[in-house]
Amino acid sequence: MSEADGPDGPGAMTEVFDAVYRGESPFGKRPPWEIGEPQPVYVALEEAGLIGGAVLDAGCGTGEDALHLAGKGYAVTGLDLSPTAVSLARDKAAERGLDAVFDVADALELTGYEGRFDTVIDVGLAHTFDAGRLRAYAAALHRACRPGALAHILSISDRGAAEMQARLAEAIAEIPAPLPDDASESPGLRRSADHLRDGFADGWTVESITGTRIRGVVPPTAELLDVHAWLGRFRRI
């Protein structure tokens, strides 16, 4: 079986996330990363002048961050592995009268997007990758970006993941309270600043990695929850 067809390949992950976006998971109709508004971090980055040129929203989900930037006049492309998420994002764009492109793509390849982007935003995609896949992702972004492009990577931390898991477990019976033991189940999966730094070591310079908050939602209650995260800013060489 090839990696692409294996349990961690894009085909398997498409099925997993499509089911989530169809409402066929313990989260119900709303997964915890679909907060119904842009992430406050990216609102602040845009206001600070740190978004520019052609923008890629990598792992865009249903498009809230991409649509926020499109509403500000940016040329935005949102890419996601899930056709269901992309369809929902396109519907939102049409309903709001916003001009944004949404397509299905594998973030570890980004074939056909070479040299297209000046800014990347990522809400919670990088933190799903182990060390090897994170390096492949950074390499794909390098190919898709122009020299000097900035990648803003918002990635939940170990502490934030534990906070979110505990709150979800209180609200949803099917979700266990403790996080899985990553050391045994996925040895390369970490949620540290060093994990991000190492992943973007080739072809990128690290401008900053700072502690911040990522916003999630507790699906049954619609409670918004801000938990600890890392914000990495990387510049393409």
Which sequence ranges carry the predicted segments?
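Short catalytic micro-motifs in class I SAM-dependent methyltransferases
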Residues: 124-128
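Conserved acidic residues
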Residues: 118
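A conserved beta-strand element that flanks and buttresses the S-adenosyl-L-methionine
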Residues: 121
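Class I (Rossmann-like) S-adenosyl-L-methionine-dependent methyltransferase catalytic domain
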Residues: 2-56, 61-115, 129-144, 149-237
